[in-house]
Design a protein with these regions (language model features):
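SAM/dcSAM-binding transferase cores
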Residues: 177-222
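Conserved Class I SAM-dependent methyltransferase catalytic core
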Residues: 3, 123-179
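Residue-level signal for inorganic ion chemistry
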Residues: 10, 99, 128, 186
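S-adenosyl-L-methionine
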Residues: 1-17
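Mobile active-site "lid"/loop adjacent to the S-adenosyl-L-methionine
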Residues: 100-127, 131
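Glycine-rich, phosphate-binding/catalytic loops in enzymes
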Residues: 91, 112-115, 160-161
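Conserved SAM/SAH cofactor-binding pocket of Class I
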Residues: 12-109
């Protein structure tokens, strides 16, 4: 699987102000989010779970090739299985981050691996948020990127689990296009939401200064 813009956006935008010591990446794919968290933070434990076997193997390989392999741990498990184990052990995470499957209103393709990565039939927002609520420390943060059209639906489910939006960034490709993505940060604390908007391009392959400044530490060339 190629590294997508969504993952890099989330990994760069996610706040580390609470100085997390334990981080969980749900649905790691290639491991990009966990690797970005290792680069940006001094967290001693960064766990990553992935249900797809091929993607999991790629995650582990990327961890081993990185400079932070001693802090990165991959688990081949479903979100539900992993959550049950963490709850049983009485553990929590200071930060949970996820670029979850979406396109819930689109028919799956013939590529089963791609389907697992992109369709909510494999990890619904309900299941994701229920798991986050069980594994997140009481003063922890949960960062996620979702389609903008799903934002209201997602945040309504989150409220059921006492998770409230604290930061929000709505993303669009350029000034002429509609908002496509919502970057959200949630916690168990109710507070005034810090909202912003990000435009990625001024023109085709001509990136805005705001986007460049956000992701510059993660691209060799942009």
């Amino acid at each position: 699987m190629k590294i997508g813009t969504d993952g890099v956006l989330l990994g760069a935008w996610c706040s580390l102000e609470n100085i997390p010591d334990t981080i969980l990446d749900i649905g790691s794919g290639t491991g990009i989010l966990a690797l970005m968290m290792a680069q940006r933070s001094s967290a001693s434990i960064i766990d990553a779970i992935e249900i797809d076997e091929d993607a999991f193997e790629q995650t582990v390989q990327n961890f081993e090739l990185s400079d932070w392999g001693d802090r990165l741990y991959g688990y081949h498990a479903s979100c539900k299985e992993f959550t049950a184990e963490i709850v049983e052990e009485g553990e929590t995470y200071d930060l949970i981050i996820s670029n979850p499957p979406f396109y819930s209103d689109t028919y799956p393709s013939n590529d089963s691996a791609r389907n697992k990565a992109r369709f909510t039939v494999h990890l619904s927002f309900e299941e994701l948020l229920a798991s986050v609520a069980k594994m997140l420390a009481k003063d922890g943060n949960f960062a996620v990127i979702i389609p903008f059209k799903e934002e209201a639906y997602f945040t309504n489910i989150a409220k059921k689990y006492h998770l409230h939006v604290t930061r929000r960034c709505r993303v669009k490709g350029n000034d002429k296009t509609e908002i496509k993505r919502s970057l959200l940060e949630l916690s168990f604390r109710e507070t005034i939401v810090k909202s912003e908007e990000l435009t990625l391009e001024k023109d085709r392959h001509q990136y805005t200064d705001a986007y460049r400044n956000l992701v510059k530490d993660f691209y060799l060339k942009l």
